[in-house]
């Protein structure tokens, strides 16, 4: 890739509002074909989330233009926990949990076509004395304490374990530069301090490429309130389809505001900027059609879950919100629905049973919905409470209940 092409690539990252800071654009422009860039992912859960996907998509963008990339899974750093801009100490994971997380996230990253390296390989044979002599000797404690990411935690308390995190992440960079010619590191904007520590380790080394290393950060994926998409706020949008279905991701993206949809489209989609601008123009001409949101949902769900995941998401959306003819709902569709809407198994089915299940608070409420023609079972409008019988079951012994416009329930007769 030529110098000019790299300039154009960086300019596009700025236009998409992906790029936050870069230590040296010139060093990125002069990146050699055998040199590469990495991003780290700590295995603190069984799945990565949408906040991580901006980093995954960045590696894919770099890969697409011919730059060597590496996804580094934090088998070592995950044991410690990154304190950067965190308000409290992170809970340490036991080895069994960490290793299970590691395996799942490794498969997840590989599913996006990314090569993966586990940083535990760097430290598994290093003892504490080696670490203090080789790593600790090369860094000044006052330099570390001055970092904003550390200073923000000093007053509330910072353990030596978490304090050491930036040393390990920094040493990762030096090791990868020395052994794999990985001289660039990217990450979220909250990682700047840790990444610059790695630059310092490299500058103090005897590497022939020590003056070529650089780091750059991306803006964090945030909601309308400026809160980052992640798991720490308690509402993670997992990339694992078993933990957060393609349908739920599709709906999440469909329900974004115009401003937020435009922002996420630029961040996460691989559509050309010209195409995105055309979609924005069409959307503004008739906002009720939600052209931007539909295209955003389509692009991101396809990129994360593939064609099958997108088709499932679109089909379930039709079933639940566009009143698809019940006869066109397949058995596989029903299996997917069971994962998405409240699902119950019962040995008998009648009006009292659906009240006992909590679908209706009382017989009075049930009758109110029936009188307003607001209860459907397997596509049939219920006009009388006595119509709620097992005769309504389908061939799979299933009942799909629609309560009003928004609430759905699946009941299986066993």
Swiss-Prot record:
EC number: 6.1.1.1
GO molecular function: ATP binding; RNA binding; tyrosine-tRNA ligase activity
Residues annotated to bind ATP: 231
GO cellular component: cytosol
Membrane-spanning residues: none
Annotated motif 'KMSKS' region, positions: 228-232
Gene3D superfamilies hit by this protein: HUPs, RNA-binding S4 domain, Tyrosyl-Transfer RNA Synthetase
Positions of the S4 RNA-binding domain: 349-414
Keyword line: Aminoacyl-tRNA synthetase, ATP-binding, Cytoplasm, Ligase, Nucleotide-binding, Protein biosynthesis, RNA-binding
Taxonomic superkingdom: Bacteria
Catalytic activity line of the entry: tRNA(Tyr) + L-tyrosine + ATP = L-tyrosyl-tRNA(Tyr) + AMP + diphosphate + H(+)
Cellular location(s): Cytoplasm
Residues reported in the UniProt entry to bind L-tyrosine: 38, 165, 169
Major localisation: cytoplasm
Motif mapping: 'HIGH' region: 43-52
Listed GO biological process terms: tyrosyl-tRNA aminoacylation
Record-linked Pfam families: SYY_C-terminal, tRNA-synt_1b
Function of the molecule: Catalyzes the attachment of tyrosine to tRNA(Tyr) in a two-step reaction: tyrosine is first activated by ATP to form Tyr-AMP and then transferred to the acceptor end of tRNA(Tyr).
Family membership: Belongs to the class-I aminoacyl-tRNA synthetase family. TyrS type 1 subfamily.
Subunit (UniProt): Homodimer.
Protein name: Tyrosine--tRNA ligase
Species the sequence originates in: Mesomycoplasma hyopneumoniae (strain 7448)
